[in-house]
Amino acid sequence: MTLTDLETCAEEIATAARTLARDGHSGGYSAGLPDHLRAVQRTLIANASQVLALASQPADLVRQLALYNQLLACLRWLGEFQVLACIPLDESVPFEDVADIAGVPECRLRRLVRPLFTIGFLCEPSPGHVAHSVLSKQFVTQPALLDAILFMSETLAPSASAMGTQTRRFGASEQAGDSAWNMAVGSDSPFAACLQQRPKVKRQLGAYLSYVSSAIDAGVEDTLTRMNWQNLGMATVVHVGAQSPSLVVALAPQFPSLRFLVQTEAKAESGGHQPCLDNHGIPALKLASIPLHLRARITWGTRLSTATQPVLDAAVYLISIPFPSPQSPAMEITMRVAQALKAHVEVLRNNSDARLILTLPMSSATRSMDAAARAAVSLSDLSLLQLTNGGSLNMGEIRDLLRSRSDGLVVMREVRSPTNAVIAFEIQYRVDNDDNRY
């Protein structure tokens, strides 16, 4: 990066900061961010990261790593003793009272929370008293945040530290039982077995992956907005295999003429009970995540992953493939892609105007990606390596799978933004599918 790049970054930071300031959130955005400002926030953070990289000296890097290492340790300590839950959400209390409730020495409590004040986590509004900040309060109201922290400190950090031992013993082994995690815990069983036996670790892993992959999720939205949605008119878009309504909630305001169906995988509920549904067919527990003004355009449905697509009149069938994880290795995801294509052959054959849009995360970071996207790809890849010796998706295999089909499905074009970590394939049914269109 040159000095000219530094000036450009500074100008973009100033522009983004003014936009955020105009929104009127004087207390910051730790409690959440309006959807229309998320892109602005990403721009601000990406440019700030670039400035930090240019202006920092080697000693600054050492200090930063030392600080975050200690901050992670402090947060783990708070989590182990449930200290955050011992502090009222809206008032300050003496350190002594919190220490008594948590059952920890007051002197330790004081020393371990004060480093967190430097990042706006907790605060000391008056001498001898501690209170929640806007940031720390979220770790009480959103337990998944603390789950992610505990997974990093209890599971991932020891595994990362054991990479040298793993390499000396197993080299470049791809066997799940030869991972750095196995070295760290002294077990011969693969990490997947741990997830089956320890629901808490499985829950923590899910929380960690959801936050680490958020930049990839944002990339899906960014890439999809580059598709030609405006010409669809008053059409239906089916989000196939959705884990949540978050993607359609992000797309719906941008395309007000479209209706969306969130199609989850059908699963038998334990005890034979089905989830409570509202009048749009949406599970009541997930209804709250859909803004009131969008609920009339978003409905819910289910389908077995092996079943033929039953929705016959949609204009777009959207399939978002996640980054491989300890629970879903790359080979399984590749098989899922093949299964999804097979399930949609008939519906696309009967409606040649319909499209299937397949989005996948890039298998490796590129120089053109923004800092958040590069970090998301790298963190996801390293986590997979350390926990299972697993690898990323083989994009060559995916492209071969798409090109070699003889069932009439043809890739019409390939779309991606150079700054994010997502690629999209637009697929239609064509009789003359001797070659692909992109």
From Swiss-Prot:
HTH iclR-type domain: residues covered: 65-134
GO CC list: endosome; nucleus
The organism of origin for this protein: Aspergillus parasiticus (strain ATCC 56775 / NRRL 5862 / SRRC 143 / SU-1)
Highest classification ranks of the organism: Eukaryota, Fungi, Dikarya, Ascomycota, Pezizomycotina
InterPro entries linked: SAM-dependent_MTases_sf, WH-like_DNA-bd_sf, WH_DNA-bd_sf
Induction / repression: Expression is positively regulated by the developmental and secondary metabolism regulator veA. Expression is repressed during Streptomyces-Aspergillus interactions.
Name of the protein this chain belongs to: Aflatoxin cluster transcriptional coactivator aflS
DNA-binding region: 95-114
Subunit structure of this chain's protein: Interacts with aflR.
Subcellular location: Nucleus; Endosome
UniProt keyword Transcription, yes or no: yes
Keyword entries, A-Z: DNA-binding, Endosome, Nucleus, Transcription, Transcription regulation
Function: Transcription coactivator involved in regulation of the aflatoxin biosynthesis gene cluster with aflR. The ratio of the expression data between aflS:aflR plays a crucial role in the regulation of aflatoxins production. A high ratio, produced at a range between 17 and 30 degrees Celsius, corresponds with the production profile of aflatoxin G1 biosynthesis. A low ratio, produced over 30 degrees Celsius, is related to aflatoxin B1 biosynthesis.
Gene that this polypeptide is encoded by: aflS
Disruption phenotype: Leads to significant decrease in the transcript levels of the genes for early (aflC and aflD), middle (aflM) and later (aflP) steps in the aflatoxin biosynthetic pathway.
UniProt record, GO biological process: positive regulation of aflatoxin biosynthetic process
Superkingdom assignment: Eukaryota
Molecular function terms from GO: DNA binding
